[in-house]
Amino acid sequence: MEIKGESMQKSKFRRICVFCGSSQGKKSSYQDAAVDLGNELVSRNIDLVYGGGSIGLMGLVSQAVHDGGRHVIGIIPKTLMPRELTGETVGEVRAVADMHQRKAEMAKHSDAFIALPGGYGTLEELLEVITWAQLGIHDKPVGLLNVDGYYNSLLSFIDKAVEEGFISPTAREIIVSAPTAKELVKKLEEYAPCHERVATKLCWEMERIGYSSEE
């Protein structure tokens, strides 16, 4: 699919990492949101970094970005390739040793993060990059595409943790959310870190988690 030239927008992001399910979900709105997000990235000249699968929401968002002419980088553990890669793949697929290396590589090559609806794996990836932001390992924005209120319960939990003193109010600001791709990417573009960092210039960035900011 070709996006009309007049709709192209300038973005400060080169690549955005999208976390999402290897399932499509029961509602068509989840699938529509994945395609809409892919189209929104294309309209802003943003490339995609994702988990490398060709099934579920992963397959839909990657296909939309690829069809729009933007570059796609899929990062997938070797052990998951038989399960999550079916048929023809799109873009560049990089095989890594394990789930930990997958997350580190996805973060390294991205300027921002977006979570579509997903399950345990999506939540685990999302919470890790939020934690890295809280620790000062990166200051990249993290967004929830809250399709049909999918993440309302998670946001309520986080607000409860702030209320009970387990998450600081400034750390709560790490996460932004919106119901549509257009609104969410706009919020990510406008994001300015305001949380206090627990550590800066962590010497264990590469040694401990295998993550380093890409120039």
From Swiss-Prot:
**Reaction(s) this enzyme catalyzes, per UniProt:** N(6)-(dimethylallyl)adenosine 5'-phosphate + H2O = N(6)-dimethylallyladenine + D-ribose 5-phosphate; 9-ribosyl-trans-zeatin 5'-phosphate + H2O = trans-zeatin + D-ribose 5-phosphate
Q: Name one GO molecular function term.
A: cytokinin riboside 5'-monophosphate phosphoribohydrolase activity
Q: What pH dependence does Swiss-Prot or TrEMBL list here?
A: Optimum pH is 6.5.
Gene inactivation phenotype reads: No visible phenotype under normal growth conditions; due to the redundancy with other LOG proteins.
EC number(s) from the headed UniProt entry: 3.2.2.n1
Keyword Translocase annotated = no
Domain of life according to the entry: Eukaryota
Q: Where in the cell is it found?
A: Cytoplasm; Nucleus
> Which InterPro entries does UniProt cross-reference here?
LOG (IPR005269), LOG_fam (IPR031100)
**Where is this protein chiefly located?**
cytoplasm
An annotated GO BP: cytokinin biosynthetic process
Keywords, in A-Z order: Cytokinin biosynthesis, Cytoplasm, Hydrolase, Nucleus
Q: Which GO terms describe its cellular component?
A: cytosol; nucleus
Q: Does the keyword Nucleus apply?
A: yes
Function statement: Cytokinin-activating enzyme working in the direct activation pathway. Phosphoribohydrolase that converts inactive cytokinin nucleotides to the biologically active free-base forms.
Family note:
Belongs to the LOG family.
Question: Which protein is depicted?
Answer: Cytokinin riboside 5'-monophosphate phosphoribohydrolase LOG3
Q: Which organism is it from?
A: Arabidopsis thaliana
Highest lineage ranks of the organism?
Eukaryota, Viridiplantae, Streptophyta, Embryophyta, Tracheophyta
